[in-house]
């Protein structure tokens, strides 16, 4: 099929790269995800797509949110600056008439990471801990998308029934406890609130308060993995996202798993493709779909 342009729309950034037939990413770039509504998102997509209209054969998009019927619907609109619904396919087709395939970003990343594992596993899951918490599931060697595109929205499984209200409208979702947004929100009661990135820096320097906040996130992820292992008989979990790939986070998740009975534990490893799993996965999926 030749080269494709892959896009990865996240809550914090939109990344783009040309993906060759051999799976190499060329000219990777990223911009901040606009927070000003549909018009700004459309303009950002045009900025990234327009220069490549005559250089690639297809467009592949991995995006946060529910991807169904060509639309992006946000379970937690706060992750996209309040944008709840966006005609993603129509927007891209208005910029370019190239063939276009859309997929949820967690699903796309799961597909790329599954390919990287080789043919060793039947059931695996990709987990992204970033602005929000999401994922993608491979079951019996097949990517689980779902009739409505919901499969893999593991950040909206329950962590604490008495917890804070999640942006999706339910109380105590994993995302409201474990995400980068939640980590930052935990510092609002501090003398000087800081970002999630700063919390990790503080923890690296031995700050006990910062370490406690990160441990709470890691424990929520470990409990969620235990639930998903029991539901899906997972063989391995791949961890990604800005929080998931932060120094020391994987080790904290593994430590939290060790407090559970052995049957609830599942091997966890960092994403092979790091921050590019979504880009590559979208392109790989498009090649199977077009």
UniProtKB/Swiss-Prot annotation:
SUPFAM superfamilies, alphabetized: Actin-like ATPase domain
Assembly mode: Homodimer.
Pathway assigned to this chain's UniProt record: Amino-sugar metabolism; N-acetylneuraminate degradation; D-fructose 6-phosphate from N-acetylneuraminate: step 2/5
GO biological process: N-acetylneuraminate catabolic process
Function in brief: Catalyzes the phosphorylation of N-acetylmannosamine (ManNAc) to ManNAc-6-P.
Family: Belongs to the ROK (NagC/XylR) family. NanK subfamily.
EC number(s) recorded for this UniProt protein: 2.7.1.60
UniProt binding sites for ATP: 6-13, 132-139
Source organism (scientific name): Yersinia pestis
Pfam families: ROK (PF00480)
PROSITE patterns linked to this entry: ROK
Gene responsible for this protein: nanK
Name of this protein: N-acetylmannosamine kinase
Recorded GO MF terms: ATP binding; N-acylmannosamine kinase activity; zinc ion binding
Binding positions (Zn(2+)): 156, 166, 168, 173
Catalytic activity: an N-acyl-D-mannosamine + ATP = an N-acyl-D-mannosamine 6-phosphate + ADP + H(+)
């Amino acid at each position: 099929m030749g080269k494709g342009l892959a896009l990865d729309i996240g809550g914090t950034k939109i990344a783009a790269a040309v993906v060759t037939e051999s799976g190499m990413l060329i000219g990777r770039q990223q911009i901040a995800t606009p927070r000003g509504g549909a018009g700004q998102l459309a303009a950002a997509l045009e900025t990234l797509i327009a220069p490549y209209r005559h250089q690639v054969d297809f467009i592949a998009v991995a995006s946060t949110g529910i991807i169904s019927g060509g639309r992006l619907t946000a379970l937690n609109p706060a992750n996209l600056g309040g944008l709840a619904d966006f005609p993603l396919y129509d927007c891209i087709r208005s910029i370019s008439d190239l063939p276009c395939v859309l997929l949820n970003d967690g699903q796309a990343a799961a597909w790329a990471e599954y390919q990287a594992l080789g043919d060793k596993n039947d059931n695996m899951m990709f987990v992204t801990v970033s602005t929000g918490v999401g994922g993608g599931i491979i079951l019996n060697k097949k990517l689980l998308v779902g009739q409505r595109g919901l499969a893999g929205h593991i950040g909206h499984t329950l962590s604490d029934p008495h917890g804070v209200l999640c942006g999706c409208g339910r109380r105590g979702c994993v995302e409201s406890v474990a995400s980068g947004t939640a980590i930052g929100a935990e510092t609002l009661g501090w003398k000087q609130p800081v970002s999630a990135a700063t919390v990790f820096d503080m923890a690296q320097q031995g700050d006990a308060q910062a370490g406690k906040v990160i441990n709470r996130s890691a424990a929520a992820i470990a409990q969620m993995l235990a639930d998903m292992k029991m539901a899906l008989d997972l063989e391995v979990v791949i961890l990604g996202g800005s929080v998931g790939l932060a120094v020391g986070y994987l080790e904290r998740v593994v430590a939290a798993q060790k407090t559970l009975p052995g049957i609830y534990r599942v091997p966890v490893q960092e994403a092979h493709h790091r921050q590019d799993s979504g880009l590559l996965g979208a392109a790989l999926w498009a090649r199977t779909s077009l």
